[in-house]
Every structure is written in C-alpha cells, then in structure tokens.
Amino acid sequence: TVHGGRDPEGVGPEGLWVDSILELKPTRPEGAEIVWEWHAWDHIASELGGIANGKPVPTDITNPKKFNINYIDLNHTSNFQNPDFYSDWMHTNAIDYNPKLDQIAIDSPNIGEFYIIDHSTANYDDPQAGIDAAAGPAGDILYRWGNPKAYGAGEKADQKLYFEHDIHWIEPG
C-alpha cells in the first residue's frame, strides 16, 4: 500500500482495503464470470507519489477526478478508536446503477462524498477491453459531491455530507 502513495501512518493492522465494483454474469448451474470491473485503486492520487498497479501515481491531489489516497476525515473520532478504520479507507456501502445514463453512483461515508463513475466502458463482446478501459482515464470520477476538502477545493465548513449511507438516483420529474 505504501508503494501506492499511502502514508504509512494511515495504514491499519489489516492493510488498506481499496474498494472495487464487480459486474458478474451468472454461469449456470452455479458460479459467475466477471464481465466488468472497476477499482478505486486505479484512480488515486498521492502527494507522496508512488506506483500502483505498475503505473506512476499522479501527485496532483486537487484533481477532482482522482481519490486522494491519504485523505482521512478526522471527524469520525469514534471510528479512529478502532484500528480497522484505517483499513476501511472509503467504507463504500451503497451503489446504484442508472441504465439510461450508463453510470454508477457510489458513496463513501468515511470521506463524506458520493461519486458518479462511467459504466459505458463495459464491453460485453470483449470483457477484458472494458476492464482495461475502466482502469484508465475513462474510469476516473465523472462527478463528486459532499466534501470538497477531500480534493483540496474547500475547507471543513464546505462539507455537505457526513457519514452518509445509501445512495439512489432520483427519477426525472
């Protein structure tokens, strides 16, 4: 993890759990195959630099399309009494898919934000091509809201979300 630019002080005894999304196609009578995947690890920035998945980690932590791997919201003091909090960095606990936009919304209570990512990188004729596309710039954050301090664009007073849970797309109208 430290090689990915995470400050060693922010790594818990269980390592660092970086969130992922897997889309599975059932294979009958049992099992499934991965047809698309997205990993937050492919979309990080760190002021410390580093290497993640064989690629240099961008150092511009103010880029809103990237996750600052060293951002921790210290307002969750009760969580910091639990060493596992450092491991569960984002604590993504909700996901919703919008088929009209082909976009996915996820939330991160530990960072105090929600994110929109592009699912149109999926390629069901060639799943690996879609997985590769999601790992590149096409898989970066399209939109984020809730805590501009997490990417250096605001102060604590600008934060709008606090340890939110559950995200849903709102139907037009």
Task: Identify the meaning behind each predicted range.
Residues T1-G173:
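Histidine-/acidic-rich catalytic cores in large beta-rich domains
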